[in-house]
Amino acid sequence: MELDYLKGHMGNNVIIFLYGDQIPKGRELEAAVEVLQPHRVSGHETGILYPPVRDGDLMVKIVGFTSRAFITACGGLTQVLGKAAVETELGRRFRLPIREPETRIILETDAGPVPITAEVVGGEAKRVWTDMGPFVRECYELGLSRLELKGVPAIKVGKFLVLDGDKVKRHHPEADFESMPVRTQKILLSLQDEFKRQTFSHYHDFSLYDWHPQFTGDLRVLFPHNLATGHVEPACGTGFVATGIGLWELGDLHRQGLTDENGATVRYECGGAPVLVGPELASLDLTCDGGRVTGATFSHSLIEIIEEGRVVL
């Protein structure tokens, strides 16, 4: 099959879009997994786009590199989509309502409708905001729990393992998250395996953070989802949200002075390379009520369209 594609990234979280009307029925997953491979288009997630089936503007089916299966949410995908809708033929292809100074798109996902808002100036998307409310609900539905992984405190947020790098270093002082040598990777893989064992989980969703920002953020974050295969995302929208929920539940956002009467605002340093040093900034706004997170919106400082092309599978 011969497929058109659009490739972009959010802080080096690489997204590939395909068009559902070009894929033979029953081969959607096959096509989505294949284009992610390094010898093909190469990326972290694929979004297969379709016309809406409910009240949204378009629908997406998302496939992850490590899961090799359909997943419910991908924040990076929504950020790239917001930019692509404004700046490429994708917007016209789906007859999306592109307006200045603000374009709002409702994306139908398996987690629910996701509002995406692009700040538009001169035909360019200067900033994109994603409402991650459906993913917040999913996290609480799947459950939160505090864990101890071989002596290292951690928290489970939905599918995610959320881990404080400093707490890892208390037990493994040799760990170096700024260069991520093989020895450090083995430590993280061991902790992730223990997380899966304790939670009876097959998910690879993993957030590693610390409170040592080097630029203008509040903390640093990295997403080493599957170090065994090299699947490390310097930025991850669902990871930003899961980390924020975990830090709210642990009380760390309050202790760091990042909360107010409505919730919290967090700035993550991230992006660039697969290490815990990122020159870019992701902003997360949490809405909280009754002691728990009820909503989340986020935006990343660097979203780029890499290329449009055609691939033969």
Per-range role (PLM):
Residues M1-E124, V162-L313:
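A glycine-rich beta-to-alpha transition motif near the start of alpha/beta enzyme domains, typified by
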